[in-house]
Amino acid sequence: MASPCLVAVLVFLCAIVSCYSDNPIDSCWRGDSNWDQNRMKLADCVVGFGSSTMGGKGGEIYTVTSSEDNPVNPTPGTLRYGATREKALWIIFSQNMNIKLQMPLYVAGYKTIDGRGADVHLGNGGPCLFMRKASHVILHGLHIHGCNTSVLGDVLVSESIGVEPVHAQDGDAITMRNVTNAWIDHNSLSDCSDGLIDVTLGSTGITISNNHFFNHHKVMLLGHDDTYDDDKSMKVTVAFNQFGPNAGQRMPRARYGLVHVANNNYDQWNIYAIGGSSNPTILSEGNSFTAPNESYKKEVTKRIGCETTSACANWVWRSTRDAFTNGAYFVSSGKAEDTNIYNSNEAFKVENGNAAPQLTQNAGVVA
């Protein structure tokens, strides 16, 4: 008969394996103790609408050795130097770093910023990350907090574009404008001046997964404004994230487009959890919603810009296999949408909502 200690160890290991195997992204790489010997395997693990994202896979490893920042003429070894190169790069960090950027950091296409193995903090009172007309970008394993507004100033956008005057920015943690194929995974985001993630101006093919969003009011905006109908082609997957504590609203807030919100865990909200305007399609599947204690805050959803309930009755907002606690409820509308929204490369298994707390227990930066 096995000893009690051995049984306890086996139970513990089985719990870990179960956690990884149920979360398709984590099971793809976290079970390999030698992941640091093949960092680029991470690019094979993305699911959902961003599943084609390559990041810097196939390129060189670039190591950040300095936390210094020069917005116009960055030096080799700094994060800005690597992020603005034209070629594919897999960016890693030589040591723990606190980086306060002087101006927004423009991230060029075919880049992975991989914080695994180091404790990397961005923001710290400065502006943060910006992507414009970029494709194939992966951001993984970063603490992004305290992002602040920036003033008008010159910034190196990329090697090919060069230095441009950049308008003042709002203080978002991550801004994506006209971006295709991007994956934001296992980051911890909080306490910024405006939003934590903005996906706008025709961006599509985006997966936002395994992140921890907390201590912030306006979390995630998908879609530019109600007049920008190019965002009708937007497709975003929001999966395996932990929202809260102290997350106010916009988890996400969508305009136009198609958003699949799957296996996320919501630890209350201040105004609403999922909202939108301009007739977005929102498919909520297998999420766990715990409502605030106030009786007037129980509804998960908020339709914005509808003078009457009938005005947005045809918007397709569906709840499937979600779990509701403390009086939370989801107001569905529209005709049932075809649930086969993914191709074979994008599709992933979605568990019932009562499994979401386990699936998200390792959300955020993994130590």
Curated annotation (Swiss-Prot):
Catalytic activity as recorded in UniProt: Eliminative cleavage of (1->4)-alpha-D-galacturonan to give oligosaccharides with 4-deoxy-alpha-D-galact-4-enuronosyl groups at their non-reducing ends
GO molecular function: metal ion binding; pectate lyase activity
Disulfide bond residue pairs: C28-C45, C128-C147, C306-C312
EC top class, as a word: lyase
EC number in record: 4.2.2.2
Keyword Mitochondrion: no
Swiss-Prot/TrEMBL GO biological process terms: pectin catabolic process
Cofactor(s) it depends on: Ca(2+)
InterPro entries noted in UniProt: AmbAllergen (IPR018082), Pec_lyase (IPR002022), Pectin_lyas_fold (IPR012334), Pectin_lyase_fold/virulence (IPR011050), PEL (IPR045032)
Residues binding Ca(2+): D170, D194, D198
Alphabetical keyword list: Allergen, Calcium, Disulfide bond, Glycoprotein, Lyase, Metal-binding, Signal
Signal sequence region: 1-21
Cofactor: how and how many bound: Binds 1 Ca(2+) ion.
Glycan attachment positions: N148, N178, N293
Pathway this chain belongs to: Glycan metabolism; pectin degradation; 2-dehydro-3-deoxy-D-gluconate from pectin: step 2/5
Active-site residue numbers: R250
Function per UniProt: Has pectate lyase activity.
Family: Belongs to the polysaccharide lyase 1 family. Amb a subfamily.
Protein name: Pectate lyase 1
Annotated organism of origin: Hesperocyparis arizonica (Arizona cypress)
